[in-house]
From Swiss-Prot:
Species name: Kluyveromyces lactis (strain ATCC 8585 / CBS 2359 / DSM 70799 / NBRC 1267 / NRRL Y-1140 / WM37) (Yeast)
Function: F-actin-capping proteins bind in a Ca(2+)-independent manner to the fast growing ends of actin filaments (barbed end) thereby blocking the exchange of subunits at these ends. Unlike other capping proteins (such as gelsolin and severin), these proteins do not sever actin filaments.
Entry keyword Cytoplasm: yes
GO MF annotation: an example: actin filament binding
Family according to the record: Belongs to the F-actin-capping protein beta subunit family.
Primary location class: cytoplasm
Protein name, entry field: F-actin-capping protein subunit beta
GO BP, one annotated term: cell morphogenesis
Amino acid sequence: MSVDEKYDAACELLYRLDPTKVKTHLQNLIALEPEIAEGLLSSIDIPLTIKKDTDANNKEFLCCDYNRDIDSHRSPWSNQYFPELSAEDLKESPFPSEPLRELEVACNNSFELYRDLYYEGGYTSTYLWDVDESTDFAGVILFKKAESDDSKWDSIHVISATHDEEGMEVTYNVTTTVILHLENLSKEQQLSLSGNLTRENSKTVKLQNVSTVEQLVPAHSSSLGSMIEDIESKLRSMLEIVYFEKTLDIYNVLRERNDDSTKLQKEQHSELIENFQKL
């Protein structure tokens, strides 16, 4: 098999396996076929992990493939890698340019407020990187909320910002993936719901009263903030109204319908909805 065929087969297999164990399955596939590791790591979303930034009072930050270099991850708070890389490796490690780093800091501060307001806790991290030598850039905005071991929400927003030739408009493209795991631990019967949902969105914004690089920072952070807020709101509604209701319909068909089982099913569905709304 060619490398492309192995990659396609691995992706197809991962889509059919238990989504709660995707990280384990991914590691096993990479160990089996190391040559497809880079492709799988960049295309398969796994639940976000958390590290502490010892250079920023042990403040926690989220880790994914986009802020990884070798086995270390860059913190958005101190702009350093943890665990610390060697001086030789650090020379080749990716860092945002100074103007983009300023925007990265502003976005992290803005989304911290968003997280407190809409998630009432949890974690958020934003990472940006330069695209060629232009003012265009790309990045990822991460959110993680775990109400308990049984209720987890991870949202990954991969963004790109492209300016027009005159520099008067910027087009934002956002690919969002939500990884959701809900579970009830009822003594009578256990029910879990896991999976991910991916959607793409784009928006073109006119840059008004923006003539310097410094003025671009609040313009970009404001535009991205409103766009992410709108995307997450729509995805939450879609998950709750469409997917949960459809799951309940399928569950009812598969289960034997008697008064006791119907009552139990409704209780389990209500518990899942309640856990979701807490995230």
